[in-house]
């Protein structure tokens, strides 16, 4: 996918990598590997420093990394797999390609590279979606409501 972006003429990209990386992987662009990050403030700074979060996951129940990037106003480009479509709303909070479609993923990246207005719109709506749907207070309130409903049902049934 990165080779495809390079082939399409995008030469001024810089990759910011974090997490566990395979050794001796060569990229067509300069890269910085920040390694495995445990400090949440540093991680938020890295997400915020990026323009696009590229998440080529093939399996994901709920994409926490996409949520983290969206919370930092960095839209995701990812595959449609597992719970990802609940997190990344295609065309609203990020761009989603069919699973394994590297050509479309490259096209999505290219679109965001060329369209700064779209990039900013996705970043803003992504932040709002992360806060309004997946923040700790929202999730806690949903769980509390579920427990209360379960208790009401239990009491009714006796």
Q: What are these model-predicted stretches?
A:
Residues 26, 81-91, 95-96:
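Short acidic/histidine- and often glycine-rich active-site loop of Leloir-type glycosyltransferases
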Residues 12, 19-41:
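Nucleotide-activated donor-binding/catalytic signature segment of Leloir-type glycosyltransferases, i.e.
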Residues 58:
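Aromatic "clamp/platform" in nucleotide-sugar-dependent glycosyltransferases that forms part
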Residues 44-50:
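Short alpha-helical donor nucleotide-sugar binding micro-motif in glycosyltransferases
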Residues 90-91, 95-102, 111-116:
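Conserved acidic donor-binding segment of nucleotide-sugar-dependent glycosyltransferases
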